Amino acid sequence: MTETTSKRTVLVTGGSGLVGKGIEKYVKETDKSNDVWVFMRSSDCDLKSRESTRSYFEKIKPTHVIHLAARVGGLFSNMKYKVEFFRENIDINDNVLACCKEFNVVKCVSCLSTCIFPDKTTYPIDETMIHNGPPHPSNEGYAYAKRMIDVLNRAYNEEYGCKFTSVIPTNIYGPHDNYHLTDGHVIPGLIHKTYLAMKNNQDLTIMGTGKPLRQFIYSYDLAKYFVWTLNNYEEMSPLILSVGEEDEISIADVARLITEAMEFKGKLIFDTSKADGQYKKTASNLKLKSLVPDLTFTPIQQAIKESCQWFIDNYETARK
């Protein structure tokens, strides 16, 4: 079976989340093949259970897997529930990769995160630096569980010849995100807070100083390069999927883009008594650039405007 010409059954775990919905939209708009894409929801299968995972793989019979499912949360939830973040993600990842091997999946691409990189490091970080030191203490439960995917990918390849690899996106945002005020990530959390501040005619309070820097990638851009990785990337080592270092932006500037997009007229107040987390996690996308020379990304102003509009249009049903 050749990977690109034969009909494939591609299982996307975590298919109803932010990245899964981005991939679903991208595939609908661009895929001209006979591939069958299955976007798994958490209600379809409990990936923390080996038995449940096996029976789902038996039913779907995937030839390829994009593994997105994870227990995720924002800074404060990661700090509070380290045991749960570690154990649940270890179980999910172990079950998915074990079933990929058992059911002879041709290729599995898992999703990691830049928070897995060492806290004390040189910048920009690249794919070779993952295991050079401990991650930031604020999310070590989640980060160590995610690092183990890279360890398992190499082990499965060495021992069984499995083609398991991973990508490392920087901070993802876009439609279908989790807009929970304390448990979501920075952009969706700020969009929701701005919406409520406008509704209640209040000022907007932002946790921390607003100084930390991040590289943000729009979920639809990430979807394009995730599918490219599934079709074209042949290495077992992870691949960073990110905008360039020059596109790093402060949380304060992101907040301003959101308030502009939503036409918020109140004051921005930075609550400096709250933790900032890591100051920066600058990632290099040179490896991706070398593989995809015509790399393009949606401008952040446009993508944030689209994300804000999606939340306003879908306020009643959005995850929050």
UniProtKB/Swiss-Prot annotation:
SUPFAM superfamilies: NAD(P)-binding Rossmann-fold domains
EC number, as in UniProt: 1.1.1.271
List of residues binding substrate: 193, 214, 276
UniProtKB keywords: Isomerase, Multifunctional enzyme, NADP, Oxidoreductase
Gene3D superfamilies found in the cross-reference section: NAD(P)-binding Rossmann-like Domain, UDP-galactose 4-epimerase, domain 1
Top-rank EC class of the record's enzyme: oxidoreductase
UniProt superkingdom: Eukaryota
Positions contributing to NADP(+) binding: 14-20, 146, 169-172, 185
Coiled-coil stretches: none
InterPro entries recorded: Epimerase_deHydtase, GDP_fucose/colitose_synth, NAD(P)-bd_dom_sf
UniProt pathway annotation: Nucleotide-sugar biosynthesis; GDP-L-fucose biosynthesis via de novo pathway; GDP-L-fucose from GDP-alpha-D-mannose: step 2/2
Catalytic activity: GDP-beta-L-fucose + NADP(+) = GDP-4-dehydro-alpha-D-rhamnose + NADPH + H(+)
Marked site: Important for catalytic activity: 113, 115
Active site: 142
GO process annotations (BP): 'de novo' GDP-L-fucose biosynthetic process
Site feature: Lowers pKa of active site Tyr: 146
Record CDD domains: GDP_FS_SDR_e
A GO term, aspect molecular function: isomerase activity
PANTHER family, sorted: GDP-L-FUCOSE SYNTHASE
Similarity field: Belongs to the NAD(P)-dependent epimerase/dehydratase family. Fucose synthase subfamily.
Role: Catalyzes the two-step NADP-dependent conversion of GDP-4-dehydro-6-deoxy-D-mannose to GDP-fucose, involving an epimerase and a reductase reaction.
Protein known as: GDP-L-fucose synthase
Lineage per the UniProt record: Eukaryota, Amoebozoa, Evosea, Eumycetozoa, Dictyostelia
Underlying gene: ger
